[in-house]
Amino acid sequence: MYISEKAKSISPSTTLAIDAKFKQMKADGIDVVGFGAGEPDFDTPQYIKDAAIKAINEGKTKYTPAAGTVELRKAICKKLKDENGLDYTFDQIVVSNGAKHSLVNAFQAILNPGDEVIIPAPFWVSYPEMVKLADGVPVVLQTTEEDEFKFTAEAFKAAINDKTRALVLNSPSNPTGMVYTKEELSAIAKVAVENNIYVISDEIYEHLVYEGEATSIAAICPEMKDLTIIINGVSKTYAMTGWRIGYSAAPAPIAKVMSNIQSHATSNPNSIAQAATVAALSGGQDEIAVMKKAFRERRDYMVERINAIEGVSCLKPQGAFYVLMNISALKGRYIGDTLINSSDDFANALLEKAKVALVPCSGFGNDNFVRWSYATSMENIKEGIDRVENFIKLTH
């Protein structure tokens, strides 16, 4: 069967692949503990669900403008002003079917065939594939655990050439959980402005910060704002992953192009979910504080337990809800008759023998790590770490 070369170049998501295996095992009645998907285990706050029900009862079930309702786009502008100190007009906002969709629109809007996009590693697994879908070329910028998985302005500058069009910046980061300081962002912004490089700033985890605070690079200076495409949404902050609402804030010409692209691909996002998002952005934020408190407690417990296991280690993340566990010392060991040579080997053996689902970071740009998510109950975390600890003790 004929399949396009572009389609064949796209790799499957390792995150969704491991999560699918986990869910199938669970459906088969197997006692398996999962740490794969990046999804809060909290319910969507009731006031948001009530707003959706109200919208249904009021007949808000028709097409909306492709870029989203004016009401929602104005609510997003208010959020950006109040929380980030950024001034946008509603015509600079495009609401999409999740932040992932917003990212796809952004790459489609700014890339010509062969344009390069710098992506710091470890990275979220979908970034390189999205760039390839837009006929761009992903260029991986490696970071180290010793540098807290952060790249420097100097490394960024050294990676730029005549084909460089954009940088992907994800802070707080999936999968590392690291957060760039305002000073670090200022240095990065200086390089971007001097070289006229777009920054795709993925800020989906901005409210899940446990030390310090997240700063949008667009707020560094007006010149940087003109080169920034902010990507955000409500999935992580408001436990609304299934509602599929993301948004972008960009210079008006880029926003218009992104809206045009979306109008031919999906039309508008779900009208009911848009109404619910207005309520989310306008309502009380108490539930966020409750989630953050729980995530912080889980993070602290997970980090302490992992670092007590011989043969593995991890840094303490500052944000998001992930921990990267370094398994490099386990490479070359066996578990039973299975040789561990990669993060995939480790994750597959762990799932098969210990019934624990972790995400291998081969698809995240660094094969020495596996990713945990602490967006699950403390009970699951304790049980999962116990199983992993016992599993590692059996390696030889």
Q: What are these language model-derived features?
A:
Residues Y63-S96:
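Conserved N-terminal alpha-helix of the aminotransferase class I/II PLP-enzyme fold
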Residues E58:
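Conserved nucleotide-sugar phosphate-binding/catalytic loop shared by glycosyltransferases and other
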Residues A37-P40, A66:
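Acidic/polar N-terminal loop/beta-strand segments that form early-domain functional surfaces
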Residues K23, C77, K81, F107-Q108:
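Generic structural signal for well-ordered alpha-helical scaffold segments
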Residues I3, A7-S13, I18, M25-V32, ...:
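PLP-dependent class I/II
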